[in-house]
């Protein structure tokens, strides 16, 4: 991080960058999913090697479970910014903060999305990049990169929590 940034800004940017990368490495899940992610039975039964959850956006319409393998880069980020693994606890409690109601939690997720966007954009600008990334990029990049790598469409759809007979995944491919 640039030397001229104060310590608090560097720490906040590091946390935001971690959440940004977690969204990509987490099968392109969104920040609401990250906020709600818990250290559940699956996490411990997998030997702390994967997360399992139902997407927040579709939980009322679908019970499709998403499984996220914890690959080494994701584990590195978890070691730096996630809460310690305690059964039933949130992985990223800082997203919700002290918000208790669903409305307050949605507001906190929206605020954290804005924080991530602001901090990551300032970081890439300091590196001389001309792009303006957002959290949406994570989902689109996940789908696009897997497609370019030749991963079957059904696998990508399942990984993203979409039904395999749906065309929703196509909306995320090559858009970014």
Report residues per predicted region.
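Short, basic (Lys/Arg/His-rich) helix/loop patches that form interaction surfaces
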Residues: 4-11, 87, 117-158, 162
